[in-house]
UniProtKB/Swiss-Prot annotation:
The gene is gh. The keyword Disulfide bond applies. InterPro entries: 4_helix_cytokine-like_core, Somatotropin/Prolactin, Somatotropin_CS. It comes from the Eukaryota. Disulfide bonds join C69-C163, C180-C188. It comes from Paralichthys olivaceus. SUPFAM superfamilies: 4-helical cytokines (SSF47266). Growth hormone plays an important role in growth control and is involved in the regulation of several anabolic processes. Implicated as an osmoregulatory substance important for seawater adaptation. PANTHER family: SOMATOTROPIN (PTHR11417:SF2), SOMATOTROPIN,PROLACTIN (PTHR11417). Residues 1-17 form the signal peptide. Its main location: secreted. This is Somatotropin. It is found in: Secreted.
Length: 190
């Protein structure tokens, strides 16, 4: 799976007739990493959901749609319009905070050790890449702020999987929008 994402990233970047900048390369890697994490999150949630009885699955879907995640108190765009209107710096900063918050919670994902280790590793790599992108895209508006405190709330499996899936989708969306805004030649449709 990693090879496929890396290959697609290289192919997409290679299509452009212009030389690839370090910023473009970092964005391609970051988008590939978060797409992988989002796929893992969807699979974990789906596997968990499939392990339940039909009635429990219905209940899980009701609960998951109303679930409060630890990241819900982060200031972030709430819809497509607000996301597209946000600055690249804001999208990168929110993405960084979401990924950083999952470094802790990923240790509690009830999955195989290999999956948990791989997720933790990818989150760390993505966090470092996002930090480089934030630094590279500073627009003179000041440094990155880590002002809000992460609230650590105990979660059950269903909440953890649902929140992980939701947050990885957010980060994937934010990074894709930021990349498309910075590199219009990437032929993005939002």
């Amino acid at each position: 799976m990693n090879r496929v994402i890396l290959l697609l990233s290289v192919m997409c970047v290679g299509v452009s007739s212009q030389p690839i900048t370090e910023n473009q390369r970092l964005f391609s890697i970051a988008v590939g990493r978060v797409q992988y994490l989002h796929l893992v999150a969807k699979k974990l949630f789906s596997d968990f959901e499939n392990s339940l009885q039909l009635e429990d699955q219905r209940l899980l879907n009701k609960i998951a749609s109303k679930e409060f995640c630890h990241s819900d108190n982060f200031l972030s765009p709430i819809d497509k319009h607000e996301t597209q209107g946000s600055s690249v710096q804001k999208l990168l900063s929110v993405s960084y905070r979401l990924i950083e918050s999952w470094e802790f919670f990923s240790r509690f994902l009830v999955a195989s050790f290999a999956v948990r280790t791989q997720v933790t590793s990818k989150l760390s790599e993505l966090k470092m890449g996002l930090l480089k992108l934030i630094e590279a895209n500073q627009d003179g508006a000041g440094g990155f702020s880590e002002s809000s405190v992460l609230q650590l709330t105990p979660y059950g499996n269903s909440e953890l999987f649902a929140c992980f899936k939701k947050d990885m989708h957010k980060v994937e969306t934010y990074l894709t929008v930021a990349k498309c805004r910075l590199f219009p030649e990437a032929n993005c449709t939002l």
